Swiss-Prot record:
Pfam families: MOEP19. This is KHDC1-like protein. It comes from Homo sapiens. GO terms for cellular component: cytoplasm. Belongs to the KHDC1 family.
Amino acid sequence: MAVGTSALSKEPWWTLPENFHSPMVFHMEEDQEELIFGLDDTYLRCIELHSHTLIQLERCFTATGQTRVTVVGPPMAKQWLLLMFHCVGSQDSKCHARGLKMLERVRSQPLTNDDLVTSVSLPPYTGD
């Protein structure tokens, strides 16, 4: 995205076809899913609303109890969530703390363009 362009459109994100072109799909451990989305996915809807995304959780019947996570929405919002998911699951205490702070942010209030731009401008974490 070019500097000076808006990360979040003034139009509802779900009305823009480009937000559905490249869904983000990955697997998450069951305990991490519960930490992020809460017991019985209590926080799923508010995370979707606050991150301007749609998140689908599909429990997989595997030995490790993984969940397939599919996210659609504005590219920078998906990138922000991916960073948050990574940090929450990190073994590094600083990265994990950063992820928990991001999680509290997205649970408590809508993400702003500043949130999205700030998170993608941070240096990538390479400690895991």
